Amino acid sequence: MSFTVHLNKILQKYQDLEADLNGGKLDNKELALISKEYSNLKPIIEKLNRYLKAHENIKYLQQVIDTEQDLELKSIAEVELYDTLNYLPKLEEEVKISLLPKESDDHKNAIIEVRAGTGGDEAALFAASLFQMYNRYAERKKWKFELLSISDTEIGGYKEASALISGNGVFANLKFESGVHRVQRIPKTESNGRIHTSAATVVVLPEAEEVDVKIDAKDLKIDTYRASGAGGQHVNTTDSAVRITHIPTGVVVSQQDEKSQHKNKAKAMKILYARLYDLEKQKSQQEQAMSRKVQVGTGDRSERIRTYNYPQGRVTDHRINLTLYKIEEIIQEGKLDEIINNLISENEAKKIADSNIQF
């Protein structure tokens, strides 16, 4: 299908929806459905109209230049034509992006899990820094950051930690954070001043509801036990901690942060739903990847995606070859927008190239 035909179909669809909304013959259910579809199309139509108007303006200005006898008016038209032609590629890009199919999970909240990798205590401290970085980023975006679990160490590091982040566009922004994050710095305990390299793994899962994943109660093994602290000592006298095993997949979720067994089970189930939904999603994506590749990086969670080098004050995202010398702003203040916006733009560019949308 040519772009012109596709464009005309979208415009006609928008006009039909507008006529239906103004017709006054819809029941409440139909009105809600059509209103939603109309709202989804509206920003696309606005971009298309700006693009079409620019083309009309180019034709008009070219005509003025070809026929106008007044040199001053002709000069003004030439300047305006130059500006419009320079702006046209940006309008084209906006239209192409608006026409790309939206990813089904982009509107969802996200569960973020950070785990210390290689590097012992230093890796655990780095994992804690990353987790706190995402907390600050969420604060900047006015998102809700709800702690789900933390397994900490005696020196203040995190073996692993997870949180539910809720708000507008959470998963769309955070989905590219999944992967191995590496840090290069001199540990406080290092007497010889040698730079150590350690790592942490970040996993970002779209929040899943019961409607997204079907779980049979008979497929769950639920164990309860006493919660323990960083040193392994028991911190609760009742069996408030919960371990849930999904037998068919072998996925295990443990939760002990709450004093209430009921609350721990609820949090564990929330994480379990997200992990099972993610398993299904990964399987589907692997099947799609056999025919096409439109994702920034490999999508493999064992892929090293970013390095934080403290001696150089440098943060490098290896998937898009982006280097920023703002390590303190990024980690201490959660200023991730520049990295994330570049990742989103790169992903959109790959999708556009794959979609073969032609003007």
Swiss-Prot record:
InterPro entries in alphabetical order: PCRF (IPR005139), Pep_chain_release_fac_I (IPR000352), Pep_chain_release_fac_I_sf (IPR045853), Prokaryotic/Mito_RF (IPR050057), RF-1 (IPR004373)
Keyword entries, A-Z: Cytoplasm, Methylation, Protein biosynthesis
Record's comment on post-translational modification: Methylated by PrmC. Methylation increases the termination efficiency of RF1.
Localization annotation: Cytoplasm
MF GO annotations: translation release factor activity, codon specific
SUPFAM superfamilies for the chain: Release factor
SMART domains: PCRF
Cellular component, GO annotation: cytoplasm
Keyword Zinc among UniProt keywords: no
Residue positions where N5-methylglutamine is found in the record: 233
Function comment: Peptide chain release factor 1 directs the termination of translation in response to the peptide chain termination codons UAG and UAA.
UniProt record similarity statement: Belongs to the prokaryotic/mitochondrial release factor family.
PANTHER family: LD18447P
Protein name, as recorded: Peptide chain release factor 1
Organism: Orientia tsutsugamushi (strain Ikeda)
